Amino acid sequence: LLHVLAGHAVCRGTAGAHFTGLLRRSFMGYDVSFHPISPEEMREWYFTPLSWVQQGQEEKVLALAAQHGMEDFYAEKYLDTLRVGAGTEPDELFDKSHGFYIAVIQGFFRDYYYTRGSAFSFLVEEKPEYARYFTPWAQVTPTAFPNPAENQIIENYCSGVYLSPKQVTQLLRDLEQDPKVLEDLEGLWSNGQLAVLKKALTAAAELGVGLLEATEVVEPNPIRPNESTSYSNLYHCDRDGVYLYIDTVSTQLADVIGKSEEQA
């Protein structure tokens, strides 16, 4: 089903084969974002307001947004996101519906962080032992949901793993004290990206909250940055990872142009 969410088309459904995910990662890439949020905030900002929308009490959502100083434009986007969430069918993947929407709504309340193509979901595919840092949705949601969950990124427009507040502090500690953890993460978050991930983890730790990853909440345009888009609040996206992406693409373009000139 194709739903329109705040002026953008969002493809929703239960499809999400692992093979499809690998293909997309190889050829299309992923815009990965990291969202500091606690289970309590998920309840306060998403699950409870979701029930308000389902009960026809949308004015409560706008009151909550105003209470947090949210601008009217983003308050409406917030409400639109909850409306889409309220229409989620019980057989839709949690990761492609509620999980993704939680990442979106987090960005209306506070900053989130971006890295191109690097995610814990991809790390745990190669190194399953890293699952010790993640908490499945069944242990996070305030009530049981019928929606099946993969608990990781399986395709675009999808939530990934969730690190609890304790897991955030544990991973930060291990990054400092365990050379193997540092090496493994540097292997995936390369070319300066690890600093962005540590910034996200540190922000979450300082707030005493967990960290949720997702894909395509924000989609930077490295060629025309002013045309970047976000289902959430674009201005709450930390710029460091975006600048790294722009620099990488600029370097790649320069290489391509240089080679084509050599061949001419």
Predicted regions and their residues:
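Short, Lys/Arg-enriched N-terminal segments with co-localized hydrophobic residues
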Residues: L1-F27
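Acidic (Asp/Glu-rich) sequence patches and key acidic residues
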Residues: L22-A264
